Amino acid sequence: MELPPGPRDDPHAWDDDSDPELEPDTDAQAEAYVARLLSPPKLGLAPPRAPPLPAPTVSFGSLEPRAASKGPTVAVPGLLSLPPELLLEICAYLDARLVLHVLPRVCHALRDLVRDRVTWRLRAQRRVRAPYPVVEEEDFDWPTACIELEQHLSRWADDGRRAEYFCLADGHFASIDSVLLLQGGTLCLSGSRDRNVNLWDLQQLGVEPSRVLVKTLGTQKNSTHKGWVWSLAALDHRVCSGSWDSTVKLWDMAADGQQFGEIKGKAAVLCLSYRPDILVTGTYDKKVTVYDPRVGPALLKSRRLHSSAVLALLADDRHIISGSEDHTLVVFDRRANSVLQRLQLDSYLLCMSYQEPQLWAGDNQGLLHVFANRSGCFQLVRSFDVGHRSQITGIKHSLGALYTTSTDKTIRVHVPTDPPRTICTRSHHNVLNGICAEGNLVVAASGGLSLEVWRLQA
């Protein structure tokens, strides 16, 4: 049955401000609401009406409903009544990810405590008990660093006994010199002196061993390249491989690893860096060459920046950084199109890992070097002996982890403190030529024709 329109249905009635009634006392209404709906009833007696109260001076927080009690109400101190120092001590026993992502949803007090950068700095330094990070930065991401540190320490606890180990020895018939993880560590590429680039599906580890090796890239009958494959680099699903045959080949992993481009140079390609707008090569003829991978790839410029072969290379939006056998580290300013710095070193760099502002590099004497990017100027700030007895061939640095490989036949796992603390060492029967870490996978390239794989706790 449809009711006839009433005064509340009149759209103009809500615009009338001439109501002579006094505005209600909202505090009194709240008190009455709590008393009426949330107080325990008494059997046989009608609840007496509370006399009108004067305007209270307490906040609405004091009027929140409380659990019914037969006796007089007693204030019981809660967790939030503890001093911040005790709350932090309790949080120290909780997983860092839970503290960062869950506790802020509980209440404002915990949110403010968790968002304090000092909270995470103290937590991280308590975990590592050493100067960290090696390069101080104003906007250092302490929460993320703390999560990575704790995860890294947990994964490699007890000398790495929790990590699953796999040896992939059936894909190449010569030394493997480069390795690259893709798609969060689910796929792996390896470049070898057998002139091939192999694609591996690491999701099949321990499930279907015969399906781990997916294919060899390329359409040539015998091999991917006509020379040793020495370097690999990737941008999203696009990959490039550099070879001693003086070519760089480009592959589309989203198209089943089909080749979509080739660069023919004049010297062996020893190192690569792949950016959205440039592809950079370091070659045996002492040159650093820049291509536009979006067109062609088209040659943009080539400079002889060194007096010996270019062995290590990386690039970001502002710089191209190259290390050479001539014992120099050259910083090229992309915007000014000129050399910004040329640093003379006592050794030559074989590998580099960069996460601004920290540049970590391994040299031919088994030492680690840390350079700091300070306002676009790179400075050598620290050098470390982490136990390697010969050349460091691979390095992977992140906020909370540090991995190195060497021709001394070891892979070493460190915490990136000052100095680095080695928490695990794995020995191999042959030299190790490089390393890559992504997600929960760590893969090392071996001169013994194999890929050495460690699957860590997720």
UniProtKB/Swiss-Prot annotation:
Database matches in InterPro entries: F-box-like_dom_sf, F-box_dom, G-protein_beta_WD-40_rep, WD40/YVTN_repeat-like_dom_sf, WD40_repeat_CS, WD40_repeat_dom_sf, WD40_rpt
Description of how the protein assembles with itself and partners: Interacts with SKP1 and CUL1.
Superkingdom to which the source organism belongs: Eukaryota
Residue intervals of the F-box domain: 76-123
PANTHER family reported for this sequence: F-BOX_WD REPEAT-CONTAINING PROTEIN 9, WD40 REPEAT PROTEIN 12, 37
Pfam (any one): WD40
Lineage per the UniProt record: Eukaryota, Metazoa, Chordata, Craniata, Vertebrata
SUPFAM superfamilies assigned: F-box domain, WD40 repeat-like
Chain positions found as Phosphoserine: 18, 59
WD repeats: 171-210, 224-261, 264-301, 305-342, 344-381, 387-424, 427-458
Keywords annotated in UniProt: Acetylation, Phosphoprotein, Repeat, Ubl conjugation pathway, WD repeat
Comp. bias regions, Acidic residues: 16-28
Keyword Acetylation attached: yes
Encoding gene, per UniProt annotation: FBXW9
Protein name: F-box/WD repeat-containing protein 9
Function: Substrate-recognition component of the SCF (SKP1-CUL1-F-box protein)-type E3 ubiquitin ligase complex.
Native source organism of the sequence: Bos taurus
Region of interest (Disordered), residue spans: 1-28
